[in-house]
Amino acid sequence: MKLVNPHYFDVIELSDENPETLVIENPHVFKDVLQALILQSEVDVGEFVLSESETKVLSLSKYTMVLTDIFNYDTYSKQLKTKLTNIIVSNYSEIDGKEKVIGDINELGVKIMNSLPYSVSFKSAISFTDVVKFLDFSFDFSEYEFWDRFIEYISTAFELLNFKLLVTINLKDYVDHEEYVELMKFFQNKKIPLLMIERHQHEELDDISHLTIIEIGRAHV
């Protein structure tokens, strides 16, 4: 894959074999790039071009996972929750006890309706989807240690939401060399293309053959 933004940087070659790093030394440009990237990852409007081939351009909002804060896992929680609900509805629609639960809910509704001193109605056509939504299933990564939680969250998101590229912001500021090596092994084993956007270089971690630098003298657009 390739990523380019004509305002800020030339083509960055992306693969699942070697993570790429984009260092933006100018704080104003750094802010501008992040704002533009986040906006395009949400509404697909902007100057970033992600392509799988010369003729196939990919939607950033559909295929790019942008993690601006590795301490916050809310960004894609709604999408993951919706996907989880759909999986449960599709795979457990014939589960034992389903009809009894739905019947009991309807019976409870009738009892309440008949006991009220008002003329009311209720949703009697309860579906299995309604029951699953009521149970409010969601992914819970709280039992994991910090980096294990990070890995599990990304792995789950890529599996269920079909992302093709992960973009992290200042990831290298939070890892030592050993942690970094283990994280890169994970991304390579999972075949997840990774672009790390950083505010400054990390000599002990950077691979100069996979490093793009927007120098501090660059004016922001």
Which ranges hold each PLM region?
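Conserved P-loop NTPase "ATPase switch" module shared by AAA+ and STAND
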Residues: I24, E159-D176
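Conserved P-loop NTPase mechanochemical-coupling segment
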Residues: I105-E145
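Short acidic, S/G/P-rich loop/turn micro-motifs used as interaction or catalytic elements
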Residues: P27-F30, S138-Y144, N170-D176, H202-E203
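Conserved Walker B catalytic segment
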Residues: D173-K191
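Sensor-1/coupling segment of RecA-like P-loop NTPase cores
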Residues: F187, K191-I208
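Glycine-rich P-loop/Walker A and Walker A-like loops and their local beta1-loop-alpha1 context
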Residues: M1-N86, V175
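Conserved small/polar residues in nucleotide/adenosyl-binding loops
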Residues: A219-V221
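A mid-sequence, solvent-exposed acidic-amphipathic segment
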Residues: L135-L166
